[in-house]
Amino acid sequence: MEPRFLLFSLLFVVFLQPALVFNMVLGYILGYLIKKNYARLKVMFLTNTFEQPEEDDIHVSDEKNPFEGIDPDVSKHLKTLGLDTSLDGEDLEYLQRFWESMSNTKKK
């Protein structure tokens, strides 16, 4: 008798409040999709971008030698750190600024 009672009560709820059942089904589907894609959604909201533009990839591949404008002491220091194999444009600028600030504090 218990399964019949549960089925009857479920049908009664569906009959009286179909919007509740509809909301429950939509909530279940939305929760499943969020749980499935949580990592990708987290990255999207943290970076405020949905996709990386392809122009950045083209810009990085166009550079022939990223170490072309570096001073010899900077390249020597990068070799000691093991960073002389590949650098992106932003990393190169950051390391140049860092090296300049280090050399300025050394001179003072």
From Swiss-Prot:
Location, primary (coarse class): membrane
Species annotation: Milk vetch dwarf virus (isolate N) (MDV)
Keyword GTP-binding tagged: no
Cell compartments where the protein resides: Membrane
Transmembrane segments: 5-25
One GO CC term, this protein: membrane
Gene: DNA-U4
Key words of the record: Membrane, Transmembrane, Transmembrane helix
Protein name: Protein U4
Family according to the record: Belongs to the nanovirus U4 protein family.
Keyword Transmembrane in record: yes
Signal sequence residues: none
Membrane topology: Single-pass membrane protein
